[in-house]
Swiss-Prot record:
Main subcellular localisation: cytoplasm
ATP-binding as UniProt keyword: yes
Name of the protein in its database record: S-adenosylmethionine synthase
Organism of origin: Leptospira interrogans serogroup Icterohaemorrhagiae serovar Lai (strain 56601)
Gene transcribed to yield this protein: metK
Note accompanying the cofactor annotation: Binds 2 divalent ions per subunit.
Keywords: ATP-binding, Cytoplasm, Magnesium, Metal-binding, Nucleotide-binding, One-carbon metabolism, Potassium, Transferase
Listed GO biological process terms: one-carbon metabolic process; S-adenosylmethionine biosynthetic process
Enzyme category, top tier: transferase
Length: 386
């Protein structure tokens, strides 16, 4: 994305969106296995539709987990606890269908086995990390405020501040840029599921005053257009309105389309899967590059071959904002970051006791605060700067 005048849009979805329900269930199952056995190999997929949950995948672990009960607890926490919504934690049919990880894959990711003795990547693939200095979190502004809106909306619902709110919700933020810098919010879209006993005008007024104006700074709301539940009604929602699947919100999970994506989803995957762990490392690297002042904007690509520990390539793009050459930056990255699967897991403490991947499954994996989000630390900035 070049430095010029443009308008850019990103979206987010709430914790009650069908795809996000699935992501949270998959990550809650992952957490339960890792808590009992840190060496668990987990690839957990979830499907939801009207009062039905199907869990499937490949899991090899010494742990014993009640996936059905975990799913019900997640659904209950989100707020689907009323059968009239068509999806209810206590009445949904929940089935689990899992089997062991293929031994052909296992030998490539288990240290001491396979053609290469070091722990190899769990699959081939390419992963991207991105950072930009237009928000304090070093995230693109459109996705940052999209997340903040649905997060605030969930807080209003759980706090019973707006009694008409129901779990399913989406947001979209359009930002106007001048000379590559954000100057104003052009458009905000919020669609939220609601109870039948509220008017569209009441919803519109409440969301503008209690959500949008509480989240987005007033100086950015300049001639901003608001579209609140623009179909006019959103009573039927959640898995009753649309089927959901794990891994179907990968752009919401990352940079809202502002940075590139390698195509691999995160939720339900243990850290041996570089789809997840290397994307976290990419963000860690890019954020430290920007935090160091070596670039205003940075995108990192890592690529792996299945069963091989070292990445097959490391690529950096600073979009003309770099203070040193990209070739020199790659050298410094290789010198300061461990890029093997084992090195990534150790550096980012991805198997640390008590870690909850479920926390990542709503409101984006990046630009977040808290001990879970170790890839958001900027402790390598000084070393990179040299």
């Amino acid at each position: 994305m070049s430095l010029k005048d443009f308008i850019f849009t990103s979206e987010s979805v709430g914790e009650g969106h069908p795809d996000k329900v699935c992501d949270q269930i998959s990550d809650a199952v992952l957490d339960a296995y890792l808590e009992q056995d840190p060496k668990s190999r987990v690839a957990c997929e979830t499907l939801v539709t009207t009062n039905l949950v199907v869990i499937a995948g490949e899991i090899t672990s010494k742990g014993k987990v009640d996936a059905q009960e975990i799913a019900r607890n997640v659904i209950r926490d989100i707020g689907y606890n009323d059968i009239t919504m068509g999806f209810d934690a206590d009445f949904a049919v929940v089935s689990a269908h899992v089997h062991a990880q293929s031994p052909d894959i296992s030998q490539g990711v288990t240290e001491g086995e396979g053609l290469f003795k070091e722990q190899g990547a769990g699959d081939q693939g390419l992963m991207f990390g991105f950072a930009i200095n237009e928000t304090p979190e070093l995230m693109p502004m459109p996705i940052y405020y999209s997340h903040e809106l649905v997060k605030h909306l969930a807080g209003l619902r759980h706090g019973n501040k707006l009694k008409f709110l129901r779990p399913d919700a989406k947001s979209q933020v359009t930002v106007e840029y001048k000379d590559g810098k954000p100057v104003r919010i052009d458009t905000v879209v919020i669609s939220t599921q609601h109870s039948p006993d509220v008017t569209h005008k009441q919803i519109e007024e409440a969301l503008i005053e209690e959500c949008i104006k509480k989240v987005i700074p007033a100086n950015l709301l300049n001639n901003t257009k608001y579209f609140i539940n623009p179909t006019g009604q959103f009573i039927i929602g959640g898995p009753h309105g649309d089927a959901g699947l794990t891994g179907r919100k990968i752009i919401v999970d990352t940079y809202g389309g502002y940075g590139r994506h390698g195509g691999g989803a995160f939720s339900g995957k243990d850290p041996s899967k570089v789809d997840r762990s290397a994307a976290y490392m990419g963000r860690y690297i890019a954020k430290n590059v920007v935090a160091s002042g070596l670039a205003d904007k940075c995108e990192v690509q890592l690529a792996y071959a299945i069963g091989v520990a070292e990445p097959v390539s490391v690529h950096v793009d600073t979009f003309g904002t770099g203070k040193i050459s990209e070739e020199e930056l790659v050298k410094r990255i290789r010198a300061n970051f461990k890029l093997t699967p084992r090195g990534i897991i150790e550096s980012l403490k991805l198997l640390e006791k008590g870690r909850k991947y479920r926390e990542t499954a709503s409101y984006g994996h990046f630009g977040r605060k808290g001990s879970t989000f170790t890839w958001e630390e900027t402790d390598k900035a000084s070393a990179l700067k040299g």
